[in-house]
Amino acid sequence: SIGSGKYAEGYQAIFEALDECCGNHAQWVIQQWQWNTNQAKSLTAVPAGRLIVLDLFSDGNPQFDRFDGYRPQCAVYCAIPNFGGRTGFFGRLPKMADNYFAYKAKYSSVRGVGAAPEAIEQTPAVYDFLFELPWMGSKPDVDRWMHEYASARYGASAARAGSAADKAWNTLLHTALDNTTTLQGPHEAVLCARPSLHVGSVSTWGGSHIFYDTQRLTGAAWDLLAAYDDVKASASPVAMANYANDLVDITRQVLTDYGKSLLEGIATASADTLSTPVFQRRRDAFLGLILDLDRLLGTNRIFRLGNWTETARRAATEIQGYDAATQDWMELDNARTLITTWGDEGPCEQGGLRDYSYREWEGMLRDFYYPRWKYWFDHGMNAPQGGWFATEWNWAHETGLPVGANVKGETGKAAQRRFYSPQPEGDSYT
């Protein structure tokens, strides 16, 4: 390891070894994440042009000005579209268009783009836009680009100018896809949080503040719903698949945002007493919303827990000599643990990684988040005596212990494992 204050010497030694091994045409690609002044000395410890610096969070918190465009080396404008895989429809398209071309004009060292997501399969428009930027000669008209994107996604006729689909995507561009803050990923779904009347964040480094007008996003969802006949008329299976995915995702986001307002209403009603009709109605609506969302997400494979867990079990078959226990290990100790506690109690609690990778998926809402909130409401808005970790661990590891159990059980046998199907159920539109 490189000791404090010895970054320049360390980087020089590493580069010399690289040069000796790979020849004098090799280039070293390095990630920049929360560098300090001493770390920046690596820029001059390596010959000019032989180091490529990835400015990882350019879309949210670019560091080009802080480090003089990373000269004398080359630098890459990068985006982190998602932290932890947390579910949410989110992007910074106008900001990316402004910043990428501004930094290219200011620093000749800035060349090209990169993506550094911690998980994928969220908001494909962000990736399409990001990777088109280097092919554009100048800053694009983002509204025009969004129109062309909708046309490519659903068909030119379905997304013609002024159509329902065209209006939906223009609204999305100026709401959920127009974040200008340093927020690490989308604002978080309070439905997926450890229960509290006031949820500031679901994960340790996230936030639940909604940065756009939710009524406008609701309007976009209605416009997208109204586009069904146009997209269907295109007779394109790809267009229909894209549409179904978008319809579920945008509707999910609208209902998720509504959940935040419901929780705020519950907090107001609880100031009096937990037995008032107003409090009980709002509580029941909140719990019902979680289950309604579960049913909606179940209509699309991408939003099903079974798509995740069965992929993990298939991956286990690549291990030589695998058996059912290997598949359980891959699903329970890896796939399910990652999206709940992240690890054992140390990383989860002391490390702050609980719910860092939460997913708003069918199966998760019904069997993990709903029981957690239901227990809390049923017990006077109190957590289990020993905290939430044991309950979360028991679900991830199929111990069979109920919500509120204060001990971690042993992993359940394969025959007792709850099966989550990856196959969609129902129709996203109806």
Predicted regions and their residues:
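C-terminal substrate/ligand-recognition segments
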Residues: 212-235, 249-271
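Intrinsically disordered, low-complexity regions
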Residues: 4, 156, 163, 186, ...
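Extended, compositionally biased alpha-helical segments that mediate assembly or anchoring
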Residues: 358-430
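Secondary-structure edge/capping motif, primarily at the C-terminal ends of alpha-helices
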Residues: 231, 235, 269-277, 380, ...
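Short coil/turn segments at secondary-structure boundaries
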Residues: 164-170, 183-194, 238-247
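Aromatic-lined, polymer-binding surfaces characteristic
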Residues: 1-11, 237, 241-264, 273, ...
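Catalytic-core regions of glycoside hydrolase
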Residues: 1-160, 166-168, 173-178, 192-219, ...
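Short, solvent-exposed, charged loop/turn and helix-capping segments
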Residues: 231-247, 296-314
